Design a protein with these regions (language model features):
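Acetyl-CoA-dependent GNAT
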Residues: 4, 8-91, 103-105, 109, ...
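C-terminal "cap" of GNAT-fold acetyltransferases
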Residues: 20, 116-119, 123-161
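Residue-level signature of transmembrane alpha-helix interfaces in integral membrane proteins
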Residues: 26-29, 45, 99, 137, ...
Length: 161
């Protein structure tokens, strides 16, 4: 893989990020309802994450967005818990350490924002992602926290920051 950089999202990244997220979801056979596929935020990710305590980061290689992930306060939850959101990578970069670097970037940002815990929800068949989360220190939960609207996600994890 060529060299890459992890950086904050810019307005001109919106279309590539939306296409990347939706292409990965289609590849994985994810339902279009009750998942990130239908999130209105996909239309303008820069605007969505250009707010207090929010950040979205992209992986760029040769002018192309090949991955991304974000941090935001956990929706409909009171407390110092953030959610790792919309972490997706193109197939060509999976398993090459890019996800671990992105995880580190996101968790460092979360700590800087004053969050004490980070929550993730995912789908049971996203095994590669779950391995990364567990290696990063996340632990399984019995049920969801907050109300993200992603009712098809049935795997919930949390990590102390």
């Amino acid at each position: 893989m060529s060299s890459y950089v992890i950086r904050e999202i810019k307005p001109e990244d919106n279309e590539q990020v939306k296409d990347l997220i939706r292409s990965v979801l289609v590849e994985m056979g994810v339902p279009k309802v009750g998942t990130a596929y239908e999130d209105a935020a996909l239309e303008d990710m820069h605007a969505e994450y250009n707010a207090p305590k929010k950040g979205y980061f992209v992986v760029e290689a040769e002018g192309r967005i090949i991955g991304g992930a974000g941090i935001a306060p956990l929706a409909n939850f009171i407390g110092a818990i953030c959610e790792l959101q919309k972490m997706y990578f193109l197939p060509e970069v999976r398993g090459k350490g890019v996800g671990a670097q992105m995880m580190s970037t996101c968790l460092e940002f979360a700590k800087e924002q004053g969050f004490q815990k980070c929550y993730i929800e995912t789908l049971p068949y996203m095994k590669q992602a779950q391995k990364l989360y567990l290696r990063s220190g996340f632990e399984s939960l019995e049920g969801p926290l907050g109300d993200t609207g992603h009712y098809n996600c049935s795997v919930w994890l949390i990590k102390n920051l």
